[in-house]
């Protein structure tokens, strides 16, 4: 796996903390653990379905990392997520650590890096990210997931993890919006320039597939997304 040393140390120290409800690797690292993709990672995502309030989870993780020599600064905090900036004790490099509350559908997988979201949960949360924000990295990861799942399957996995109504016209807008991202948004995550047109064409293919299904179901593919 393409795991930078500071990220690996951070993960090892979180696992060693022995939390009552384990934090599982999520995001791009989880997709990589399942063999879907290998790319640079801007942050570390960890997820839990434990009942503890996120404020308590963030405080517990922060203390555990501080006890092991990391410097920790807590950033934004919501009931479902927390952002921490963690400074590696050996290199002085900083890493962004994102904590998430999730409703998981499958048992965690076990890897050398510790617990990891099951493949379906890892992909579902990534499709939710594509739906919610539509970042270039989300599109890269969604295409990697398409090696294992068809378009309707990806949509269903995303729907299972959605926190708001999940409608196909909104997903379409995220897919077609990839044309507005500069190439640098893709190359920053390891995609070579020659592959970017193929990725955009794949996104258009998915959008067209959604449009065809909406027409078959009697819905207009140009309908405004639900508010």
For the regions a protein language model found, what residue spans apply to each?
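Compositionally biased terminal segments of proteins
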Residues: 1-227
């Amino acid at each position: 796996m393409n795991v930078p040393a500071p990220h690996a140390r951070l993960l090892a120290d979180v696992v060693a903390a022995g939390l009552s409800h384990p934090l599982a690797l999520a995001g791009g690292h989880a997709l990589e653990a399942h063999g879907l993709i290998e790319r640079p990672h801007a942050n570390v995502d960890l997820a839990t379905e434990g009942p503890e309030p996120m404020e308590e989870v963030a405080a517990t993780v922060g203390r555990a990392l501080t006890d092991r020599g990391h410097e920790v600064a807590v950033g934004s905090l919501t009931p479902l997520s927390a952002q921490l900036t963690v400074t590696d004790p050996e290199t002085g490099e900083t890493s962004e650590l994102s904590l998430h509350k999730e409703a998981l559908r499958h048992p965690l997988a076990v890897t050398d890096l510790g617990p990891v979201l099951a493949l379906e949960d890892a992909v579902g949360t990534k499709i939710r990210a594509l739906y919610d924000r539509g970042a270039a990295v989300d599109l890269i990861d969604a295409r990697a997931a398409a090696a294992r799942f068809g378009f309707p399957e990806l949509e269903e996995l995303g729907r299972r993890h959605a926190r708001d109504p999940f409608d196909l016209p909104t997903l379409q807008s995220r897919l077609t919006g990839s044309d507005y991202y500069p190439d640098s948004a893709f190359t920053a995550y390891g995609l070579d320039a020659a592959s970017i047109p193929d990725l955009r064409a794949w996104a258009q293919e998915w959008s067209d597939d959604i449009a065809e299904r909406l027409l078959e179901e009697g819905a207009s593919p140009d309908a405004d997304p639900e508010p």
